[in-house]
Amino acid sequence: MLGSSVKSVQPEVELSGGSGSGGDEGADESRGASRKAAAADGRGMLPKRAKAAGGSGSMAKASAAELKVFKSGSVDSRVPGGLPTSNLRKQKSLTNLSFLTDSEKKLQLYEPEWSDDMAKAPKGLGKLGPKGRETPLMSKTLSKSEHSLFQPKGGSTGGAKTPLAPLAPSLGKPSRIPRGPYAEVKPLSKAPEAAVSDDGKSDDELLSSKAKAQKGSGTVPSAKGQEERAFLKVDPELVVTVLGDLEQLLFSQMLDPESQRKRTVQNVLDLRQNLEETMSSLRGSQVTHSSLEMPCYDSDDANPRSVSSLSNRSSPLSWRYGQSSPRLQAGDAPSVGGSCRSEGPPAWYMHGERAHYSHTMPMRSPSKLSHISRLELVESLDSDEVDLKSGYMSDSDLMGKTMTEDDDITTGWDESSSISSGLSDASDNLSSEEFNASSSLNSLPTTPTASRRSSTIVLRTDSEKRSLAESGLNWFSESEEKTPKKLEYDSGSLKMEPGTSKWRRERPESCDDASKGGELKKPISLGHPGSLKKGKTPPVAVTSPITHTAQSALKVAGKPEGKATDKGKLAVKNTGLQRSSSDAGRDRLSDAKKPPSGIARPSTSGSFGYKKPPPATGTATVMQTGSSATLSKIQKSSGIPVKPVNGRKTSLDVSNSVEPGFLAPGARSNIQYRSLPRPAKSSSMSVTGRGGPRPVSSSIDPSLLSTKQGGLTPSRLKEPSKVASGRSTPAPVNQTDREKEKAKAKAVALDSDNISLKSIGSPESTPKNQASHPPATKLAELPPTPLRATAKSFVKPPSLANLDKVNSNSLDLPSSSDTHASKVPDLHAPSSSTGGPLPSCFTPSPAPILNINSASFSQGLELMSGFSVPKETRMYPKLSGLHRSMESLQMPMSLPSAFPSSAPIPTPPTAPSEEDTEELPWSGSPRAGQLDSSQRDRNTLPKKGLRYQLQSQEETKERRHSHTAGGLPESDDQAELPSPPALSMSLSAKGQLTNIVSPTAATTPRITRSNSIPTHEAAFELYSGSQMGSTLSLAERPKGMIRSGSFRDPTDDVHGSVLSLASSASSTYSSAEERMQSEQIRKLRRELESSQEKVATLTSQLSANANLVAAFEQSLVNMTSRLRHLAETAEEKDTELLDLRETIDFLKKKNSEAQAVIQGALNASEATPKELRIKRQNSSDSISSLNSITSHSSIGSSKDADAKKKKKKSWVYELRSSFNKAFSIKKGPKSASSYSDIEEIATPDSSAPSSPKLQHGSTETASPSIKSSTSSSVGTEVTETPAHSVPHTRLFQANEEEEPEKKEVSELRSELWEKEMKLTDIRLEALNSAHQLDQLRETMHNMQLEVDLLKAENDRLKVAPGPSSGCTPGQVPGSSALSSPRRSLGLALSHPFSPSLTDTDLSPMDGISTCGSKEEVTLRVVVRMPPQHIIKGDLKQQEFFLGCSKVSGKVDWKMLDEAVFQVFKDYISKMDPASTLGLSTESIHGYSLSHVKRVLDAEPPEMPPCRRGVNNISVALKGLKEKCVDSLVFETLIPKPMMQHYISLLLKHRRLVLSGPSGTGKTYLTNRLAEYLVERSGREVTDGIVSTFNMHQQSCKDLQLYLSNLANQIDRETGIGDVPLVILLDDLSEAGSISELVNGALTCKYHKCPYIIGTTNQPVKMTPNHGLHLSFRMLTFSNNVEPANGFLVRYLRRKLVESDSDVNANKEELLRVLDWVPKLWYHLHTFLEKHSTSDFLIGPCFFLSCPIGIEDFRTWFIDLWNNSIIPYLQEGAKDGIKVHGQKAAWEDPVEWVRDTLPWPSAQQDQSKLYHLPPPSVGPHSTASPPEDRTVKDSTPNSLDSDPLMAMLLKLQEAANYIESPDRETILDPNLQATL
C-alpha cells in the first residue's frame, strides 16, 4: 500500500467465511502464502472480511490475495516473503514513494523474520495465524510504479491482511521513504503498535500497508479477513493514508534500526493482539485493549503509531499547511480545495464552490496531484454524476456536494463523515486546524490530531510535509486512483488503469454500476484520487466509510448473489483498505478543512460529544437507504437510539473510551488512521463503492443493500458492489488499527458509539460522526433529533436535492467556515459547505475557510437560502458540523449540489429516499436524520456493518447523521459539539473535532470493522442476529464485534478490527513489556477518551437539545401556521356552508310562500295571469333553484375538496351549472304537450323573473354567488324582477278576491301544477344525482388527465435541456396545459359554464358532462396503421404522431371532427409543405376515441365524445377497403399518383423491377407493395405468402429451381394455399436477364403466377431483344425526381413533428438544420454524378438516421461525414476515374459543407470534417497519399454503406500500403492536420 502496487488477483474474495479461500491457490506466491496462512488458520485471513463473514469460526480462508510488488530500481528492499517485486506495479505518479509502516520498516530491518511473520501467522496472531504472512507480497515495497497497493484478491481475505503491516515493512524500502519529505515518525514502542494497529486497525494498516493488507496480511487480520472474505481493494485514499504512515515508519526506520526493530515488534504484537481481539470479537468477546492500543499509539506518538505515521492523515497537518502529506486522503479536500479547486478544470471547476475551494485550499500542494486525480475522477464523475461536482473538496465542500449529489455521493458516503475521517487524519496532523474541519476533525479526536500532528510534524517539517504531500499526495492521488483499481471490485469507479499514471476510474464500470446502483456512480468518481478532489472523490472517500457497509452490500448486490456474499466479506476487508484509501482521500479533504477545523475547535471533549451525536446520526441510516441494504436491514428501529452509534461504535469507542485526551495525539493519529480506514471504506466506496454506497443510500438504501448482502446492491452498483467488497476487505486491515482504537473507544462505550458513527460518517461526517460518536450513545437519542433538526433544514433542501446539489456544494463551502460555524449563514453554509467548502475550510488557515465561505459559501448560502436551511443556520450556529450532518442527511442535497444534473439521475431514486428520510427526520422523527447518520456510521464502522444489517436502514441513516452531528459541533464550538445539535453541526464544531477525532480514532477502527464487515457479510447477519447493529449502542456492542462484525464481548478492548490489531500486535510486539506498555497507554488513552467523551457527550447533549428545541420550535411554528391556514379555510368553508344553508332555508320558506300564493291564485278565479305566472313560476323556479342549490351544496362541497383551487367562484359556477341544467331540463318539459296548460299560467318569461324574484327576496341571506348565478341564469329577464317584488300579502288578497266560478279551473290547474311540480322534482333529483355522479367522474377523469399531463411534462423536461420557447402548433395547447395544469384548469372552468348557462338544448347527459367541461382535455392525435407481420424482419412504424388538440369537456362530435381535421391539416402542411403527397382531410376515414369509433361519412355515435379517461384519438386513413391508397401514401411518403401508378402496373403485369441508386427506398417500397397485394387478395396471412430471394446470397440457379417447382405445383393445382402470393427478388445483379429466367422457369398460366417484384441498384439497359418478353415492367428511381427527390424532406419533417418538438429549445434552428440535410444530399449526389459512375450514387436513406436535436445532429453528422460519406465518395471517385477518367474539375465537397454548416457553433466544427482528396490517376501513384490517408483514417471506422465496399476499401488500402511502406510517414502529418 505504501508504495507498492498491490494487485488483487482475486478481487472478489468470497464474502462468506472463506469459501473462496481455496479458489486462488493458483494465484501468486503471495496469494499462495496468504492462502497457506488461511489454510493453516482454517479460515480466510481477510480479517475484516472474515469477521464480517460471521463469527471467527465462520471465517473461511479467503483465497489469499496476490499482492504483486513491483520492485523499483530505487527501492532496494525486497518483499519479505521473497515475493517478487515483479508483482508490484511501478507508481506512475511522483508519489511512487514506497512508504513503510513501522511494522514494515521493522520487517525490512528484519526481513527474514518479517517474512516469516508475513508468511506465517504471527505467533501472537494465533487466531489469524493460519494465514500467516507466507507471502509478504505486500505492496509495502512500493516501487516507483503506480503507487498501487497490493490487492490480494483472495489472499487478503485469507489473512493477507495480517501481513499488512509486516508486508509493508518488508516491501517498503527505506530508499523509498526519502521520496517524499515525510516527517519521520520516531519508532516509539507504540509505533509498532501503530503498525500493528495498521494491521489491527485495518484502517491505518490498510492505509499504510494497503497493498500489504491486500496481499494477505490475513494473518493478523485473518479473522477479520475471514469475515470480510472480500479481498482487500486498496483505495487510492487509503493508499495515500498508508503512505503517510509508511513514510513515517520509513523515516523512523531510517532513524534507528533498534527503534525500528522495537516498533516492528510492537507492530507485530499489535497485530497479534488485534488478531486475538478480532477472533474474540468474532466469538462475541470484545477486546478493547487492541483498539485502545491503536488510539494510544496515535496519541502517544505519531511515530510509534505506525498508523499515524503510515496514514496520510498522520501528515494531515502538513497537508493542511500545504505540505505534502501523503495523507491527503478522505481529508485531502485541501489539496483539491487549493490546488485542485483552483486548477479545477474538470467538473470541479464547473461549480463556483469548487473554485472557492481552490481559493480556500491552501491545501497541500499534493492537492494538485490529487486535483489531477480528482479531475480524473471528475471526468468519470462527469459522465456519471455531474462534473464531479463534489470534487474532493473540504468536508463541507464534500458535504455540500454530496448533499447535492446526495444520491450518488451522499448515499455512497457520508461526505461529511468520510471526508471527516480523512480530515480527521489530517486533523491528527493539524490538530487545531483539523478540528476546524468538522468532518475530518470529527474523524480524528482533536487532541489525537494534535498528537498526530506532532508526530507528523516530528517526522516532517512543514516543507517536508509539503514535499511529501506533493509527492505523497500525488502518490496518494495516484495511489488513490490505483487503490480504486485495486478496489476494482471494491470501488469500480476507483479502478485504475495500470497503464495510466493517473488513477483511471475503471469507474465507468463502477460508475455505471454505481449509476445502476443509483448513486454509486458518483461515489465511484469520488473514489478517484483526482476525483477525490474535495468535492467528489473525497466525498466518495468520506462516504466510503459511511457507505462502506452499504457499499459492501451494494457491491455484493452488484455482483451475483453468491458473489455478492463473497463480496460482502470482501467488502468488509476492502472496506478497511478502502477506508484507508478513503482516509487518504479524506485526509485531503480533512486537510483542506482541517486547519479551520483545528482552529474552530480542537477540544477533544467536544469531539467526543460529537461522538455521541453520531449514534444519533445512526438515525440517518434511513438516509442511506440506497447505500446499504444491510443498513436498512440493520437500521435500528430506534432511529435515534444510540444503537446507530454501535454501527460505528467500535471506532468511536476506541478513540473515545481509550482517551479523550489520548485522542489528541495518538487518537488523532489513530483517528486519522481510522479516518483513513473509514476513508478506505469511503475510499473504496469513494472510488466505486463510496460513490456507490452513498449514491446507493440515495438510490438503493445502503442499508438495504447491506442487508441484502448484495441482493440489492447489484442493481445499484455492480462495480460499486465490488468496490464495497473490496472496501470491506481493506476495512479490516485498517480496522485493526481502528479496532484497537475501537477497543479503547469500547471502554467509552457511549463514546465509542459516537465515534463509530463518526467513522461511518467519515467520508463527510466522519469527523462529525466520530466527534459525535463519543456522545453518540448518550446523545444518540437526542442528537439524532437535533441532527435531524439541523439536517432537516438541509434535509428539506435536499428534498430539492437535485437543485440543491449545487447549493449544497455552495453550502459546503460555508461549511469550510466551520470556523464561522457559529455564523448563521455559516451554519447554513457549513451544511452545504461541509462537502464543498470544508476543503477550503480545511485549508491550513481559517482564512481559506472564510474564503470558501465567501465564494462557495455565499453561493451555497444562496442556494441554501432557497432551502429552509438558511434560516436553520441561525438556529444552529455550529451548523458547519451540522451541515456535515446535514450532508449526510442532505446527502442528496449535497450531491445534487455537486452534480446537479447527475445527482438527479442517481439521486432521484436514491436521493429522494434519502431526502424523504432526511425530511422525515427533520419534520418529525429524529430517526430519519439519525438513520442517515447511522448509515454513515455503518459505513464508518465496518463492524457496524453487521450492526447495520441489524439496524434498519433507518439506523444506518441514523448513524450517519450521528456522525455528521458529531462533526458538526466540532466546527462551531466544542461546547455545542456535545449537544445533539452539535451533531447536526459536526462540520460547524470543528474544535470539538479534536474530541471527535479521538473518538474518530476509535471510530476509525470501527469503521474499518464496519468495512471489514460489509453489510452483506455473514458477520453482518450475525450482528443483526444479535441485534447489536440495531439495538446495541456502540458501547453496548462489543468492539470486536463491531469491528470485525463478529460478536465480541463488549468489555473486550479489541474491536473486530482490534482483533486484527491484536494479531498484528502479537506479531508486532516481540516483547510482552512493549505490549503491556502499549496496553497501559491504551487504557490511559481510553480513560482520557472516556472523560473526553463524557464531556463531549454532555456538550453534545446540550447542543442536541438546543437543536431539538430549535427544530421543535420550527416545527411548532410550521404547524401553527398550517393550523391557522386550515382553520381559516375551514372557517371560510363554514361560512359558505352557512350562507348556502340560509339561502336554502330562505328559498324553502319562499317556496312554501310561493306555493301558498299559487294555491291562492289557482283558487282565485280572477288572478292576474302575471300573478299566477309569478306564483307558479315561483314554485317551479324555487324548486329548481332549491334543487340546484341543494345539489350544488352537496356536490360543491365534494367538489371543493376535489378542486381545492376553486374558491367562491367555484360556487358560482357550480350553482350556475346546476341552475342551468335544472332550467334546461325544465324548459324541455315545458315545451311538451303535458306542460301546455302550465305554460298558460307561467310562460318561460315569467318563470325566469320569478326566479330572480325569489333571489331578490333572498338577497339578504343568499350568498352573492347564488344571486349572481340565479340572475345569470335568469339572463336578460332579470329586469322583470321588480315586477315580482309585489308583497305576498297582496297576492294572497287578490287570490281571495278571485271569483269562485273559476275555482274548478283553478283546482284543476293546481292539480296539474302539483303533478308538474312533482315531476319536476323527480327530474331535478335525477338530474342532481346524475350531476353528482358525473361530477365525480369528471373530477377523477380530470385528475387522471392532470397526472398524465404532469408525467408527460416531467418526461419532456427530463429529455429537454430547458423549457422550449416554441412548439409545434399542434402541440402548443398541450404544452401550455402541461406547464400550468392548474391555470388551464381554471380557464377551462370559466368557459364551460357560460355555454352551459345559455345552452337550453342540452340533453340531460350533456348537462351532466358540463362539470367535466370545466377542464379542457388535451387529446393526442395519432394515425394508427394496421399491424401486419407479413414480411419477416420487417419492422414498420405502427403509430404516427400528428399533434395534440385541446377540446373542452363538453365537446360534441362535430367539434371533435373539426379538431381532428385541423390537426391533420397542420401535420400535412408541416410534413409536406409542397403538397406533393396528395393527402388532405379527405384522406381521413374516421377515428376512434377509446372504444367509440367515429366514421366521418356515417352518422355520429349516440354517445357523446370525450368521455372520461380518454386522451388518445386514433385516426384511420382511407385504404384498400375504401379503394384508396391514402394510408399507403401516408406511410411510405410516396406521392399518391405515383403509388397508384405502381399498383396499377403490378395488378396489370404482375411483375415489376425497381431500379435506382442504393438508399432510395426501393426495398422498403417493395415490402409495402407486397403487404398491399396480400391485403387486397384477401388470402389468409401465412409465413410463406410472401417469399423473399436475396440475389446476393442465392444464385440464379436456386431461383430457377424454386420457380420451376412452383410452376409445377401451380399446374397440378395442388396446395394452392401454400403458393406464395408475392415473390420479392432483392438486389438483382442483372435485371435484364431476370426476365428470361422467370419466363423460362415460371411456365404456368400468367394469371396464376405470383406477383414478382425485384430491385436492382444498376440501371436497366433494355435491349430490343429484352423488349420482346418484357414480362417485367421497369420503374426507375432517380434522386432527381420523385419519389426519392422529396422523400428526405418529408421524412425528416415527420421525424421532427413526432419528436415532440416543443422539447427542442429552438425550433427554427432545428428546422434550418433539417432542411439543410436534403441540400447536402443533393450536393453530394451532384458531385457523384460528375465524378463517379451512374450506379454509384448516394440515396436519401444515408441520412435517415439523422437525430432530432442540434447537439445530437452535430456529433452525428461529423461522424457520418468522416466515417461514411468520405469513404463512399472516395470509392465513387475512384470508380469514376477508372471508368470515365477525369470527367470534370475536382471540387472538394467539404468546402461547400463547411461553408453551409447550419448549426450555431459550426465554425468550431469545420476543422473536424475530413477533406476528400482528389483520386490519383494511377492506383498506386505517389500522388494519392492524401487520399490514402483519408481512407486510412476513415476505413477502420465502420462504414455505414455496404460492408462489402468497406472490405474492399480495406483490401485496397492494405495493398497500397504494402506496396508503398514509406507512405506512413507521408500520411502522418496530414492525418494530424485532419484531426
UniProtKB/Swiss-Prot annotation:
GO biological process, one term: microtubule bundle formation
Tissue: Expressed in heart and brain. Present in brain (at protein level). In adult brain, found almost exclusively in areas of secondary neurogenesis from the hippocampus and the subventricular zone.
Modified residue annotations for Phosphoserine: 93, 145, 197, 202, 299, 311, 315, 365, 394, 455, 477, 479, 493, 531, 544, 651, 752, 756, 762, 799, 810, 998, 1179, 1263, 1380
Residue numbers bearing the Omega-N-methylarginine modification: 690
Modified residues (Phosphothreonine): 162, 537, 547, 575, 1004, 1168
GO cellular component terms listed in the entry, alphabetical order: axon initial segment; cytoplasm; microtubule; microtubule cytoskeleton
Molecular-function GO terms, alphabetical: ATP hydrolysis activity
Assembly and binders: Interacts with tubulin.
Name this polypeptide is given: Neuron navigator 1
